[in-house]
């Protein structure tokens, strides 16, 4: 949909996922906040992020290798076709390897200590929190010792319970999670 206030927008199951008017703020902040904690940018993993904005930002930050785990290639195709400025055809870049299917199944075969950064760009609903919590051991296993996991946790003012749930998941595994 092309919304007057937000520009071209993607809706899935009646929920807005991304809008061209403010996507850059989201993706640049999302990737940049992790880089403020760890400047290493050799390898990144993206879990979700079908619109391509996080992949675009990882490319712009000169990550050498980006593994993008996305469940639904159709979402990426639709975004490339209708919201092309967001992902800038990130799937066609040599530094990006797309792994289609269940990300949490796919990462089970990844070597330990592989990624400097893991960007978890899933929906901000309880299902995704539970899914990430169930698979946090796998995420921690593939993260380098000084690596950083950055997650889309939702809005503190609109979904405070979900934000608290995410913080509990991270504090249980790391003990040092902050907003």
Per-region residue spans from a language model:
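The AdoMet/dcAdoMet-binding core of the Class I SAM-like
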Residues: 21-173
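Short strand-turn-strand beta-turns centered on an Asx-Gly dipeptide
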Residues: 12-14
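Short, isolated positions in well-ordered beta-strands
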Residues: 17-18
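A short glycine/small-residue-enriched secondary-structure motif
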Residues: 9-10, 27
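Conserved S-adenosyl-L-methionine
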Residues: 175-179
């Amino acid at each position: 949909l092309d919304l007057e206030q937000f520009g071209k927008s993607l809706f899935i199951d009646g929920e807005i996922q991304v809008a061209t008017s403010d996507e850059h703020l989201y993706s640049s902040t999302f990737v940049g906040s992790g880089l403020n904690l760890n400047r290493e940018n050799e390898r990144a993993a993206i879990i979700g992020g079908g619109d391509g904005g996080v992949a675009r930002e990882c490319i712009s930050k000169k990550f050498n290798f980006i593994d993008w785990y996305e469940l639904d290639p159709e979402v990426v195709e639709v975004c490339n076709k209708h919201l092309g400025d967001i992902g800038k055809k990130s799937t066609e870049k040599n530094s990006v390897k797309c792994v289609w299917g269940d990300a949490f199944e796919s990462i089970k075969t990844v070597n330990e200590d592989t990624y400097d950064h893991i960007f978890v760009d899933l929906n901000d609903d309880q299902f995704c929190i539970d899914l990430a919590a169930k698979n946090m051991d796998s995420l921690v296993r593939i993260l380098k010792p000084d690596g950083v996991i950055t997650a889309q946790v939702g809005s503190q003012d609109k979904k405070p319970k979900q934000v608290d749930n995410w913080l509990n998941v991270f504090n249980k595994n790391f003990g040092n999670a902050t907003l």
